[in-house]
Amino acid sequence: ISTHQYPYYPGSGSEKEKGKFNNVFNIPLEAGTTANQYLNAYEHVLNKLKEFKPEFLLFSAGFDAHIDDPLAQLRLSSEDFYTLTKRTLEISKPFCNGNVVSILEGGYDLKALQESSQRHVDALIEFNW
């Protein structure tokens, strides 16, 4: 499952792209997507999680959707990343039972990356207490 700005380099990631085994779910977002629009679109991710019932959750934690990031033109705040992480963990808890790994992927404004990563980790820690 991927939420990302589209169209954007390298040109892949449209809704129509499903992968060789029909197991790719892209949620493309236009440049300028606001936090509310992003969070509403993210409900599709949460619904797919409920449907799939994963036993393991791997966060590919990219923070280039932050409003201050120079790469993408999405408009999330550090607090929005906390909300996304928390909601994902809440939805997946019955299936994953705490089997969660997070890998840092992107974020190119160092201050925004630090703040967003911290809020993501805050949600992970709270989830595991």
Roles of regions detected by a PLM:
Residues 77-78, 110-127:
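Short, electropositive alpha-helical surface patch
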Residues 92-100:
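A short helix->loop->beta-strand "cap" motif at the edges of active sites that frequently abuts
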